[in-house]
Amino acid sequence: MHSFFTDPATHIGPEGQLHVWAMAKAEVRSALAPFAQACDAFDCLGLQPPSALHATVLRLAPHDGDVAAFCAAFRRECDGLGELHLPVQWPAVVEDSVICLGATTPQWDRLICATKRASIQAFGDEATPYNPPFSPHLTIAYGVCEGDDEPIVAALQQVRVNMLRDTDDGRAHDVDDTAADAIGEDQFCTLDIDSVVLARVYQDRQVGTYTCDVLAEVSWV
């Protein structure tokens, strides 16, 4: 495990910058709680607060702007999109964090495009200089210093084994059968998205968290 926050070129603190987040719903936060508890045992990890558990849609350049204009433009751009049901993998250790990787679907790509267009309409042509995330994902914990991956992997695997043992059908949670094909047997749950938040985001490198002030929540369903 390496620190998520050591490369200023990619992980520079947002310092109140606007982001568009898809927040994890209560059932997903509850499902991930045992994994977060397992991660909390490791000093090299900083837990993301459950209330701020999210999938980043897009990071924006502005620190402020016409929130009402963004919401109106976003609803227009998302017309006909429908609710997203993204299959999400079991929590896994990557180089600098513990994440649940989601499937990139045509709906997710359209959501990103809608967010870009709405941001430009509301905040100007320079509003979206950043690339979207490599894939939709939820980060349970960020690396804050060097650490050994193996015990983290083992702890997460034990939680998974316990969950599967406690279910009748070998699945920890109900999932969308159609979307499941995108990830297959490694699917943990489904991330349902019918709204996003426009938020002013803050990074705490010492404890390894991203938190936010929500400026608006906007739904298109």
Residue positions per predicted region:
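Helix N-cap motif at beta-to-alpha junctions
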Residues: 61-64, 105-108, 144-147
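Small-residue-enriched alpha-helical segments and adjacent helix-cap loops
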Residues: 111-119, 196
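Hydrophobic side chains in well-ordered alpha-helices
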Residues: 31-32, 70, 111, 152
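The feature marks the first
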Residues: 9-44, 50, 57
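Extended intrinsically disordered, low-complexity coil regions enriched in Ser, Thr, Gly, Ala
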Residues: 47-52, 66, 150-151
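Extracellular/lumenal glycan-associated surfaces
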Residues: 49-61, 133-143
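Flexible phosphate-binding patches that engage nucleotides and nucleic acids
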Residues: 1-26, 68-96, 121, 126-221
